């Protein structure tokens, strides 16, 4: 039984990735803040694909260590880590509340890096696994009114490229 962990799984790319992985018969750990939506997705996936689905209603930016502990305590081996949770803010950079940017960086960068660090070490020990960090075309260029988001996605791209090079030959695939 192979497990995939998907953050930001309650909608959008994360939700679609969960369905694609379930179709491939991966058991799932779905993580997002919106528990009701996660439970609905879980029920639908279990009904359609018959796989095991765990739901964690956690703010990834605050609880990425709790996600790891949940898996360790249940002896769940994560074969695929999909770091999809993230958000952006639209507005003039200097007029935004700095707390918004702090939260964005905590989620888009700090939590992503933390999850890679925790699960990546286990994958290296097993000489297998796949880390997918969801980036954006915004990471390739700067832009007005979302400058911190653009910068956070540039971080994701560059961090992922560096991690891929470090883990080359370790049996762990890393992509963005």
Enumerate the predicted regions with their spans:
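Residue(s) in the substrate-gating loop at a strand-loop-helix junction
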Residues: 136
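Substrate-binding pocket helix/loop in short-chain dehydrogenase/reductase
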Residues: 92-105
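Active-site loop immediately N-terminal to the catalytic Tyr-X3-Lys motif
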Residues: 143-147
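Conserved NAD(P)H cofactor-binding loop of Rossmann-fold oxidoreductase domains
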Residues: 84-89
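Conserved glycine-rich Rossmann-like NAD(P)H-binding loop of the short-chain dehydrogenase/reductase
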Residues: 24-40
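Active-site helix of classical SDR
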Residues: 116, 152
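Conserved glycine-rich cofactor-binding loop
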Residues: 10-12
């Amino acid at each position: 039984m192979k497990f995939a962990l998907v953050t930001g799984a309650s909608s959008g790319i994360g939700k679609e990735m969960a369905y694609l992985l379930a179709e491939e018969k991966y058991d799932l750990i779905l993580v997002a803040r919106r528990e009701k939506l996660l439970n609905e997705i879980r029920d639908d996936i279990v009904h359609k694909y018959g796989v095991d689905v765990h739901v964690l209603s956690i703010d990834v930016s605050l609880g990425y260590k709790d996600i790891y502990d949940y898996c360790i305590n249940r002896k769940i081996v994560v074969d695929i880590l999909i770091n999809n949770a993230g958000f952006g803010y639209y507005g003039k950079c200097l007029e935004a509340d700095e707390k918004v940017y702090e939260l964005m960086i905590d989620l888009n960068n700090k939590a992503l890096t933390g999850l890679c660090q925790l699960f990546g070490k286990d994958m290296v020990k097993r000489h297998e696994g796949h880390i997918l960090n969801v980036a954006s075309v915004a990471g390739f260029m700067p832009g007005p009114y979302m400058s911190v988001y653009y910068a956070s996605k540039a971080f994701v791209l560059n961090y992922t490229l560096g991690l891929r090079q470090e883990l080359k030959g370790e049996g762990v695939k890393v992509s963005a």
